[in-house]
């Protein structure tokens, strides 16, 4: 079987059938950022995978029930869907994603900086860490943002979550990260979940 994070569309064996809705306890497994053990086969039309057998590797109750965590999960899930183009078998990336999801699930303190922390680790795993001297290369980060990035990488996860940042700072940081990723991937990145994320952290 294969164990992985839900990033792209997948349907139970047989696909959608009129009059045969998926049972609630089955569909609940397939929320954004669910981590499952599964046996998959390629669909006839390619792209869409069919799940023959699947079960949750972890139960993630707080991500499902807490609005802040579920919004962060939705943002990360959409980001991965639009930017993660690596072939299967990247164990290092998988371990990073699994660890990040479990940290989000188990966090009991402040998490307003979680998506910033995640973006640092994610871009690093993709091969273009947002640190160092870029010289004449495209750099969307301001000097103040670079100070925050460096500090966040030098402290623990718990300390990074407590790092003081204004709402506007977080929003600007995300925008800078998306421009940075667009430059390195060569693709435009438009996330529908970004507006919801900003609204959640408005207060």
What residues fall within each predicted segment?
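Non-catalytic alpha-helical scaffolds and adjoining flexible linkers that form interface surfaces
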Residues: 1-203
């Amino acid at each position: 079987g294969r164990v992985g994070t839900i990033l792209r569309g997948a349907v139970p064996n047989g696909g959608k059938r009129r009059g045969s809705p998926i049972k609630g306890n089955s569909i609940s497994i397939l929320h954004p950022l669910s981590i499952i053990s599964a046996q998959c086969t390629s669909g006839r039309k390619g792209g869409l995978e069919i799940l023959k057998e699947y079960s949750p590797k972890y139960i993630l109750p707080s991500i499902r029930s807490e609005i802040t965590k579920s919004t962060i999960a939705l943002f990360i899930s959409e980001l991965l869907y639009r930017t993660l183009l690596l072939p299967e078998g990247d164990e290092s990336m998988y371990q990073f994603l699994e660890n990040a999801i479990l940290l989000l699930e188990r966090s009991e303190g402040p998490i307003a900086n979680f998506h910033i922390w995640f973006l640092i680790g994610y871009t690093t795993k993709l091969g273009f860490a947002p640190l160092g001297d870029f010289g004449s290369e495209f750099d969307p980060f301001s000097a103040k943002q670079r100070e925050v990035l460096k500090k966040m990488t030098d402290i623990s996860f718990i300390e990074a979550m407590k790092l003081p940042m204004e709402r506007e700072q977080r929003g600007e940081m995300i925008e800078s990260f998306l421009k940075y990723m667009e430059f390195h991937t060569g693709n435009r990145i438009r996330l529908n979940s970004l507006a919801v994320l900003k609204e959640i952290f408005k207060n």
